[in-house]
Amino acid sequence: MDFFPKKQPTLSNFIVGSNSEAVAVISELKEGRGPQFTYLWGYEGVGKTHLVRALGKQSEGVPAFDENRTIYAVDNVQDLTPEQQQELFVLYNTVREHPGTHLVVTADRSPKDFERQGFRKDLTSRFSWGVVFELSPLSDEQKRQVILEAASQTGLKVAPEVLNWIENNFPRDMHTMSNLLHSLDRYAMSAKRAVTIPLIKEWLERNQDTKEDR
């Protein structure tokens, strides 16, 4: 999970949880080994983009094939336009023709689910080439421990009762938690106060007032 966006995503700061097999494959790819095709899927916040960025090979959209390049990555393929789908189709075929090159794609759904979403079938059939991994989210206890550790590393102290209140009043996905902690850290520092439930409620009210003034 990518908890603090200011950090460069790496394999060392990825919280593995139950995704050890997928992380092992990404590690192999960084070393120039591993499967030619890798498909990572899962809900938002499970770490797909983190792993792609850890490869250091992410491009905007669909990258063109380059004889001097060995790893290609395409993030969030569910958002591709019809033109980009054609580009990815060509990339799949070209990579397959060049042993020693690798392609990693990520999505928010399984390859089979794409078949019911109107994507071109000759592309979605290629999503199952190579290995397919569903990334699993962290358990609530794992999330809690990582949030506390990450907050501690930035000097942000969050009491257990405050964390309980946050978990009961905000979505528990890690993107939300990460952004929330960053915002609360900045607000608490500017107010020169500790992060407490009253401070969080005050912060929420101010944000609501700001939205209404727009």
Predicted regions and their residues:
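Dynamic helix-loop-helix/coil hinge segments at AAA+ ATPase domain boundaries and subdomain interfaces
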Residues: 1-23
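Walker A/P-loop nucleotide-binding motif
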Residues: 34-51
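Conserved P-loop NTPase "ATPase switch" module shared by AAA+ and STAND
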Residues: 63-94, 102-110
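Conserved AAA+ ATPase "SRH/arginine-finger" region at the nucleotide-binding site
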Residues: 113-115, 130-142
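The conserved phosphate-sensing helix
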Residues: 170-184
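Conserved C-terminal helix/linker of AAA+ ATPases
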Residues: 188-207
